[in-house]
Amino acid sequence: MRRSLSLALLVGALAVPLPASAESWCASPLHAHEWGVQAFSADGAPLAPALSNHFHRRPSTHPPSRTPPVRSLPPDTGERALPLLHFYSGGTLTSGPIPVAVEVGFTEGDALAWYPQVDERRSAATANGAAARLAREALLRRRAALQPHATARTGLDGDPTAQLVWNALSLTPEPQHRPTRADAAWVDRFRDFGALWVNGARESERFVFYEAVTHERVALELTRGDRYRPDHRHFVLRNRGAHAVHDVFVTHRERDRVFVFFAPSIPAGRSAGFVLEAHAVTDVLPWSAGSAADFVAATRARLRERLVDADSPTPPTSMQWSRDDCVMMRDPAIPTTTAEGHRLYAHEVDAILDVWAGTFFGSPGTTIVYREDPAYLDRAMPLSIYTDMYNHVKLRRLGLAVWRL
């Protein structure tokens, strides 16, 4: 599975309405935060997460929505397993619903489930084929040639390599359709964010969800080092992937002893060696009875510090742009496709850890946790996020992997 629990958040800052006669404005930041946890078995193969039965697994038989795609909105003339997108906003330059479109691809697998219902569904064979790649290259050339001030514009198609396409979602404070009851506990946990409702043609949910079956393998390899002895357990952790991995935790539990090794980053093709006995954590209680301060500091608290955006730990509550970061001439036909980083808001990270800290750090034996590089996520799970000319997307993607040996 591409993501055993992922959450992506789009957070829109409050915007102060401008007079209708204003000739120009700065587009409001729409912060897109995607996160996910990918679980691997001892042999490095992905593990399947628990999905709610209300998620879709087949395209709709209803006629497609008549709402025009977000990418066709006028430009301003003056973004794998269980990803979810949550949206927050204190308001925008317009008073109505916020239009958003999402396209997701999976370069190493096939989409399995999604919600709300998509407008378009392509198989992996089609989306990852040579013809789709060529069509995408042509699309990128056409996007680059767009002239924002042109009065006559030729419409652009969406990304032909996307497997799941939502052309015209709307974000509102209240749901436009009755939400479906979920039968997976984690769904209710991540509905409780006070986020905007995401409305499709016939369904409303607190998030956009997508999941795929992929052929990805764990990026790391753990072997004994050349100085290994029973009382001096020397291990080497090698990154065999093409991208760096970050925030690497190796937690080993044996009887009443716990060891935690941490590496801030391991570049592609490089290794990190450690002696297990040098990383014993003192004052540790059994996980079921609660965690002692030293253990929490070495695990959950440390990971939290690495993931929370210290400069912006909470969503914006007012318009936050200045002359230095003013974005103008926005064209809805041009999506945001590249992540600018990985750090999230504190409540997002706390929710991830509330669900996953026991799996990350409380399992018997050896467990390895690491953060995937945003560039890897952009390649393995291409994400495009469109919005109107009054907003611009700032994308962050957090991918965590947990490997239980």
Q: PLM ranges: what are they?
A:
Residues 1-8:
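Bacterial N-terminal signal peptides that target proteins for export
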Residues 17-21:
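N-terminal signal peptide c-region/cleavage motif recognized by signal peptidases
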Residues 23-405:
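Protease-labile, long low-complexity intrinsically disordered regions enriched in Pro/Ser/Thr
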